[in-house]
């Protein structure tokens, strides 16, 4: 009987990243997908800064940036003219190595992940479908329908449902999926064209209650149009054609469409599962939460789910932690998912609201306020931190402890760079580690050496103070680079006690 450590259902970005992380840590992975081949079209485009930071651990960031398209600015149009230009690169400057919005279509993204996964000898098993599963004490027994129609019974220690909004894993677990469906029909079109909206920047039309944006793609004259319709056209979504929706882009944003490469329509839901874990089965990505595409958050959130769960599964499976560590996955990720759904719902509701007041706010007030907001450093920083997901934290969660400087346990480690070095360089290692900014004690050095815990001591510099880091304390960092302990002293007993209390024996890097 086929037995794996982790059986992953679904080979979208979430499932592929989970498989890649686990494979890099020596976990026996099996990943299946009911589709016969990878997707050749996609809806997801944006790769946020936090995802690129985490991708450094998998040596993926450079490939994504090189093959994608960096968006330098967002333009807002009213009555056929661009009225506001918001420079994106300056908004996040100094906060992250990736102070920009990266456009990298999901189909290309998946091909990159599959290629890297195959380098570990792991292939996605296509045309293979999960029919059901049961927990059997020390594992899970799953029933798979194979490409030839045969039924396979296999065993796995843990099962990860990355199988989308219609997840068979979630349905088998009988987990509730409360929420609703937007009345609008979304459409997406890949086009070759020209015009002022094809200058490599993002363009958004604010004229009407229906959303319309032009996203640049890599390559001359390539763009993706994403929009909504809610009138009588929405009642016949299955027969909607590009010609039915293209006039607004042509008339309002002066788009000259030379070739239509792909067109599709779909409905969007906003839902969060009641639970992200039941026993040995986990829900990730769209199987756990779906929401409006506003802000380009969905795919990035699923990838965040995968990375959060991967290091915990690897630690438990290797004997580096007690099984209780897995209890922290749901509270850490479900809180963010609920907040995200509420936030994107508010943004989408504003952009698509109807009525004279809503029209006035969109076409008159927003174009006036946006540049004012962008000129204020605090507003700029808040906007970038939120959209880029670098503001996501696990404060107040069971694995988070202490505060040093302005950094709390559960925070993303702030990026500090002043030309002398980058404190993120050591984070490429998939392990627990300690960062000290300033001086540390001989006891800390000796303890870390004795326990093979990587210790990185950075001489104190103004850049660290500017980033909010505390001087001469320490930060214990989790394998997913979030701060576990922020401490003002340099006593290694704090680390020893933390590991003991949480049943963790640090799991160090790739085998």
Please report, for each region that a protein language model flagged, where it lies by residue.
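Glycine-rich FAD pyrophosphate-binding loop
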Residues: 23-43
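FAD/FMN-dependent oxidoreductases across multiple families
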Residues: 67, 237-297, 301, 321, ...
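Conserved FAD-binding catalytic core of PHBH/FMO-like flavoproteins
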Residues: 82, 115, 122, 158, ...
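N-terminal Rossmann-fold NAD(P) dinucleotide-binding loop
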Residues: 15-16
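Active-site-adjacent segment of FAD-dependent monooxygenases/related oxidoreductases
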Residues: 40-44, 48-112, 116-118
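Core beta-strand elements of the Rossmann-like FAD/NAD(P) dinucleotide-binding domain
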Residues: 2-4, 148-158
